[in-house]
Amino acid sequence: MALYEHVFLARQDISAQQVDALVEQYKGVIEANGGKVGRIENWGLKSLTYRIKKNRKAHYALMDIDAPAAAIQEMERQMRISEDVLRYMTIAVEKHEEGPSAMLQKRDRDDRGPREGGDRGPRREFGDRPPRRDGDFQRGPRPDRAPREDRA
């Protein structure tokens, strides 16, 4: 049997209990076809980068699966039929990762230094250019226009 990581996105208007029921349904499909489901993570309701089937948010779920290819094909077939599943992706892996996935790990932002004064430094000088004057658009005297020949 092969090892897989499977992630699917469920519609935003279903509840968390319905997402758990979907996970259990697909877990049952895998087990009925001779596979095992290891870690199951529910990442919750997250914003999508772009709309998928008129949804701006989706419930994310991850499953670590040890199953034959036929079990994965059957699960994906049922996901294509289901209206609650927006997208899914199954990836074959060498081994399953231990511990929580990257989406569930708390990001430690303390290692960043303080950001004093924004992230841009002071304006640099451009050598022979005069200093910039904001709002002062005077560029010196302008010569008079020549008379137009085509005026009637």
UniProtKB/Swiss-Prot annotation:
Residues 96-152 are annotated as: Disordered. GO terms for biological process: translation. GO terms for cellular component: cytosolic small ribosomal subunit. This is Small ribosomal subunit protein bS6. Belongs to the bacterial ribosomal protein bS6 family. GO terms for molecular function: small ribosomal subunit rRNA binding; structural constituent of ribosome. The lineage of its organism: Bacteria, Pseudomonadati, Pseudomonadota, Alphaproteobacteria, Hyphomicrobiales. Keywords: Ribonucleoprotein, Ribosomal protein, RNA-binding, rRNA-binding. NCBIfam families: S6. Binds together with bS18 to 16S ribosomal RNA. InterPro entries: Ribosomal_bS6, Ribosomal_bS6_sf, Ribosomal_S6_plastid/chlpt, Transl_elong_EF1B/ribsomal_bS6.
